[in-house]
């Protein structure tokens, strides 16, 4: 079995007496989509924040490519190849599509931001940004203001910005949120193709997308993983059905 690209060992977080992450163990392997599902308030956002560096765990470690990144800031994890997309858009709406992608590429580099010279003049950053826009199908809209994109296209742009990091692993927080049937199908196809470039840790409420994409599913309830395994096993697990999926799954 191949070594995991991303690994979580014994991650624990408490807010007073409330345990929001209870000794969580997770792995993400090359070529894999590992979905995390669970009801609202289960602790998914808190878990993702700890994995990506926005929140420090009380116990446990996070490893990326075999290196312990637990004590690193979010930007340093990103530069090491941990690429995150957010449930709520973090794009610069008044900038162009290309500018958003170039700024993503600049953030991934260790070069100075260069406020006194146009970053679009950096041919290396522009080339990387354009390649990532092309990968998600937005290169023809590079000059458009981001605010003019559809909701689905903004989701695609968020993936393109994440791609500029040349990621080792993606952490995606509800990429299907707000998408209709057509947009959801397009995003499903995009994510399915991305897994060979970098595996995806996917937090998602859209169960059709989860069961279509995931190689493994972990179910988080009240800060604890109650089940983890292939989709068919999760679908028929009675504890999972009782806690989250219901009998109609």
Predicted regions and their residues:
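Glycine-rich phosphate-binding loops of nucleotide-dependent enzymes
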Residues: 2-249
